[in-house]
């Protein structure tokens, strides 16, 4: 059911699907030999580039986390993110600093800049079959223009808001540099603490380690 729901959502946004599909497919022929050669040193990669995109989802973060969401407008975004792992404890947990540059399409056309610190859990019992991580990040977010969908949520919406993300990555041990990404991209004022309004974007993409 979860996979069918995601396919139904993303089938409505062919531009996002096209960009992410091309990004996923094109590098693989050149990457396989290099990745297989470096399989034992995957934990030594400290830099990560993530490309992801998806639609604006309603009604709130809680529903999006539970995949109980609806897509009610023609607003979606694509984001490129660069992260650096600055601390790791064995193969259990790591911390990263990440900067992002995003672009909106459809109903909105502004840009977005984000910066965050990420905590990532690395240890799962099935990792030798499907390498898996779960991450939570928090930081700040700036829109180059006030978002209309965030104004619909609250008339006092502004450019600066808190940024929060939840992310799952899945990959094959044979290709240690590459992972599939599902990321929830969330902006909010933390109940008015740093601003008003908010938005949620359930996104898919890929992550490349180097």
Regions found by a protein language model. Give the residues of each.
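Cleavable N-terminal export/targeting peptides
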Residues: 1-43
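Short, flexible coil/linker segments at or flanking structured domains
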Residues: 12-14, 19, 37-39, 68, ...
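Short glycine/proline- and aromatic-enriched beta-strand/turn motifs that initiate or cap beta-hairpins
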Residues: 29-83, 207
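A generic structural signal for short, solvent-exposed coil/turn residues
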Residues: 25, 41-43, 70-74, 89-91, ...
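Generic structural motif recognizing short loop/turn segments at the entrances and edges of beta-strands
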Residues: 18, 22, 45-48, 93, ...
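Outer-membrane beta-barrel transmembrane domain signature
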Residues: 84-197, 201, 207-210
């Amino acid at each position: 059911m979860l996979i069918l729901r995601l396919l139904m959502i993303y089938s409505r946004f062919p531009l996002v699907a096209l960009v992410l599909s091309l990004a996923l497919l094109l590098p693989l022929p050149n990457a396989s030999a290099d990745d297989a050669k470096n399989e034992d040193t995957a934990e030594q990669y400290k830099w990560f580039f993530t490309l992801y995109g998806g639609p604006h989802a309603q009604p709130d973060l809680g529903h999006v986390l539970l995949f109980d969401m609806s897509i009610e407008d023609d607003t979606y975004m694509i984001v490129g993110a660069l992260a650096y792992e600055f601390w790791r404890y064995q193969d259990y947990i790591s911390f990263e600093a990440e900067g992002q540059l995003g672009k909106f399409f459809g109903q909105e056309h502004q840009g977005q800049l984000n910066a965050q610190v990420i905590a990532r859990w690395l240890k799962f019992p099935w990792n030798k079959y499907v390498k898996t991580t779960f991450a939570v990040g928090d930081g700040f977010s700036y829109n180059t223009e006030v978002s209309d969908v965030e104004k619909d949520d609250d008339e006092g919406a502004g450019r600066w808001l808190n940024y929060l993300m939840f992310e799952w990555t899945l990959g094959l041990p044979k290709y240690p540099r590459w992972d599939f990404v599902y990321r929830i991209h969330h902006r909010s004022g933390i109940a008015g603490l740093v601003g008003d309004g908010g938005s949620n974007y359930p996104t898919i993409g890929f992550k490349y380690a180097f």
